[in-house]
A protein has these predicted regions:
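Acidic, His/Gly-rich catalytic cores of divalent-metal-dependent hydrolytic chemistry
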Residues: 142-219
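Anionic-ligand binding region
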Residues: 114-156, 162
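Short acidic-hydrophobic surface loop/beta-edge motif
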Residues: 86-94, 140-142, 177
Length: 219
């Protein structure tokens, strides 16, 4: 995905949070974000790593993975996580872009296409609102403004599947947002990656409950 971002010539990169919890290479991931020079907002999974209370119930297995991740990150990595802010506000091409994880109010909020009232409320003070959390690529215009959810880089899945049958797809999702004096437009990207290489990284990582995680990826 990073190669695709570089190929299309994106001028500004923003990460909408949930960066490393559950992944096989947490320290390497933070290093890659640093190399990209991108602003990163705080997601609920990042907050969980930092010991904050989050809305979604957690399991003993998730807590074991959290402890392992914290160990992998070390003090310097945890310091980087603590620097993540709930929102990032950018002024680009005369457009106000507000970036968050769930909503500008909370990383736990869920914004969906059918939630017109919530979307109307959050778009009041932005030309573009970018949010994640649901792992679902979608966009909607609200007057002259634009909401965009870029999907998920590492845990993309088919939202038509029952929750108990979810399998992650081997694609990295992101969105390109084009801005000029006329407004904003969006293009969704889905970049295939080598799932066998990912499986090897998970097996080699020492991550707790790796076998259960491997079963979540589509074959």
């Amino acid at each position: 995905m990073v190669a695709d971002i570089e190929r299309v010539g994106a001028e500004v990169v923003v990460c909408l949070g949930d960066t490393v919890q559950g992944g096989a290479q947490p320290a390497e991931t933070l290093e890659r974000l640093k190399a990209l020079g991108c602003a990163t907002v705080l997601g609920n999974a990042d907050a969980f790593l930092l010991g904050e209370d989050v809305a979604e119930p957690t399991t003993p297995e998730q807590e074991q993975i959290r402890d392992w991740t914290v160990e992998q990150l070390g003090p310097s990595g945890m310091q980087r996580l603590r620097a993540f802010q709930p929102t990032a506000e950018l002024e680009l091409e005369g457009q106000k872009v507000l970036c968050c994880h769930g909503s500008p109010r909370s990383y736990d909020d869920i914004l969906l296409p059918e939630d017109q009232t919530a979307l109307d409320a959050w778009m009041v003070d932005a030309d573009v609102l970018a949010g994640g959390h649901t792992h679902k690529q979608w966009t909607r215009r609200i007057g002259d403004a634009l909401f965009v959810n870029p999907g998920s880089v590492g845990l993309a899945y088919d939202h038509h599947q029952p929750r108990e049958a979810i399998r992650f797809q081997p694609v990295a999702e992101y969105a390109l947002v084009f801005l000029d004096e006329r407004g904003a437009a969006v293009e969704f990207r889905r970049i295939p990656y080598d799932v066998d290489e990912l499986r090897e990284a998970i097996r080699a990582s020492g991550r707790p409950h790796a076998d259960e995680h491997l079963r979540m990826y589509a074959t």
